[in-house]
Design a protein with these regions (language model features):
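N-terminal lobe/hinge region of extracytoplasmic solute-binding protein
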Residues: 54-105, 138, 207
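Gly/Pro-rich hinge or "lid" segments in bacterial periplasmic/extracellular proteins
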Residues: 86-92, 181-238
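Solvent-exposed coil/turn segments that connect beta secondary-structure elements
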Residues: 56-59, 89, 106, 117, ...
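Short, low-complexity disordered leader/linker segments with a strong preference
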Residues: 1-51, 92, 105, 154
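Surface-exposed binding/hinge segments that line
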Residues: 149-194, 213-218
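Aromatic- and charge-enriched surface segment that lines or borders ligand/interaction sites
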Residues: 100-144, 158, 164
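Short, solvent-exposed loop/turn elements at domain surfaces
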Residues: 47, 59-67, 92-94, 173-176, ...
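Short, well-ordered beta-strand elements
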Residues: 47-57, 110-114, 136, 163-165, ...
Length: 242
């Protein structure tokens, strides 16, 4: 199998300069409102060997703890970082790293099962465990001060795949519907010793457990390259190979 690399072209400053100085509408300028991403080498099975995406963000900072810059926006959309849930084409929540859930106690508890028994690893080869789930909640609430999980007041480990989230104000539905699709998992073995996670940009700050891993950055060319972790991820085909 060919090397699986997802190429990301980042020309934010140039794009902003071109469009920021013109008051013309797309119709007046003759420029279409959108253009297809560049693809190369599509085979009969619909697999694209290379996909190039332009985005109006700089390549820095490169850390799971930020949603700014190109890397942060890619993770917001679950490239390197694995999210708890995803939304389908009908905007309905679907399982991802959280494979099932049950709302108990009139909305004050979420019993959630995670894919910690499916052989998923972090991009450095370490296994993804239920301790990473518990750690993620603690990190986001107590150090990153994120609002996504602010309604979760406690976490109890049930077994190696399941936890109970205690939720304030009966906000279980809110937490699942408005937050879980944006929550990225953090590897405990990397982040537990970081005193200031919001400012950490070490080489291992990019390690996630999502479908693509960051393999190369060229700041001068403003490009980032991602590599697919395999042909499938969580049972779904990764149709972009390189």
């Amino acid at each position: 199998m060919k090397k699986q690399v997802l190429s990301l072209l980042l020309a934010g400053a140039l794009t902003l300069g071109l469009f920021g100085c013109s008051a013309q509408t797309p119709e007046e300028s003759g420029v279409p409102q959108s253009a297809p991403a560049q693809t190369e080498g599509t085979d009969s099975a619909g697999v694209v060997e290379e996909l190039k995406i332009g985005i109006c963000k700089e390549v820095t900072p490169r850390t799971l703890a930020s949603e700014s810059g190109s890397f942060g926006r890619m993770n917001y959309n679950a490239f390197c970082a694995g999210t708890w849930l995803v939304r389908d084409e009908n905007n309905e929540m679907q399982p991802n790293l959280m494979t099932s859930w049950e709302i108990l106690d009139k909305g004050s508890t979420i019993r959630a099962t995670f894919a910690t028994d499916q052989g998923i690893t972090w991009h450095d080869g370490e296994p993804f465990t239920i301790d990473d789930v518990i750690f993620t909640v603690d990190l986001m609430n107590n150090k990153l001060k994120s609002g996504y999980l602010s309604k979760i007041t406690g976490v109890e480990k049930v077994d190696d795949t399941t936890v109970d989230f205690q939720v304030a104000d009966g906000a279980a539905y809110f937490t699942l519907g408005n937050s879980a699709v944006f929550v990225r998992m953090y590897p405990k073995h990397i982040w537990e010793g970081i005193e200031d996670p919001s400012g950490y940009t070490g080489e291992d700050a990019v390690i996630g457990c999502g479908p693509y891993k960051l393999v190369q950055v060229d700041e001068e060319a403003q490009t980032m390259h991602y590599e697919a972790v395999g042909e499938t991820y969580m049972g779904r085909a990764l149709t972009v190979r390189s």
